[in-house]
Design a protein with these regions (language model features):
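Active-site HxH/HxHxD metal-binding segment of metal-dependent hydrolases
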Residues: 1-51, 151-167
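C-terminal regulatory/interaction regions
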Residues: 163-179
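Metallo-beta-lactamase
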Residues: 58-65, 69-159, 166
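Context-gated lysine
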Residues: 11, 16, 21, 38, ...
Length: 179
């Protein structure tokens, strides 16, 4: 969902299923383009794809659908960094884009995807995990957002393996109606 103005790039890496959607309907991600913009060269990626950043640095693509159907995360062994975007919430919230009527179906799919990701995440335990929004790590409670924005938040829950485990539990509790 963070692909606004992708037409300003020569080449864009995008999950293979989203590339296929664009090929079938160029308007499916119309908000991604500037007015009158055209899609750049789209490079399909999927679980196991490796993107060469140059200088001997690569990132491995790991599927983690949920925030969007085809969300991915990127692991960089060179810098021991995992870039999760919005694919992993914070243990406090689940960041998903779906119609409300599809919420439980998407939650069940997200839970399954998190469970599949867990064994891979174990190998990334000692990596630095970077989310899409720093507020994810500082709680999203509206009463405390101003504290976070002012740099005086007392809540800090950095993204890490345990958050993935917490998100599985959170999904289950939402699915069963416990919360």
């Amino acid at each position: 969902d963070h692909m606004f103005r992708i037409d300003r790039f020569e080449k864009v890496y995008l999950h293979k299923n989203d590339v296929e959607k664009i090929r079938e309907d160029e308007n499916c991600f119309a908000a991604a383009l500037s007015d009158g913009g055209k899609y750049p060269h789209l490079v399909p990626i999927d679980e196991g794809s490796v993107i060469d950043l140059g200088g001997g640095v690569t990132v491995d693509v790991l599927n983690l659908g949920g925030h969007t159907e085809n969300s991915v995360v990127f692991a960089c062994a060179h810098y021991k960094a995992l870039f999760t975007g919005d694919a992993i919430g914070s243990g406090y919230i689940i960041l998903m884009i779906c119609p409300e009527k599809d919420m439980y179906k998407v939650l069940e799919s997200y839970k399954k995807n998190l469970e599949c990701f867990l064994p891979r995440a174990e190998a990334l335990r000692d990596y630095a995990w970077f989310g899409g929004h720093s507020i994810q790590e500082n709680g999203c409670d509206e009463q405390h957002q101003q504290d976070y924005l002012a740099g005086r938040s007392v809540y800090y829950n950095p993204l890490r393996l345990e958050i993935v485990q917490d998100m599985v539990v959170l999904c289950e509790k939402l699915i069963t109606g416990e919360i």
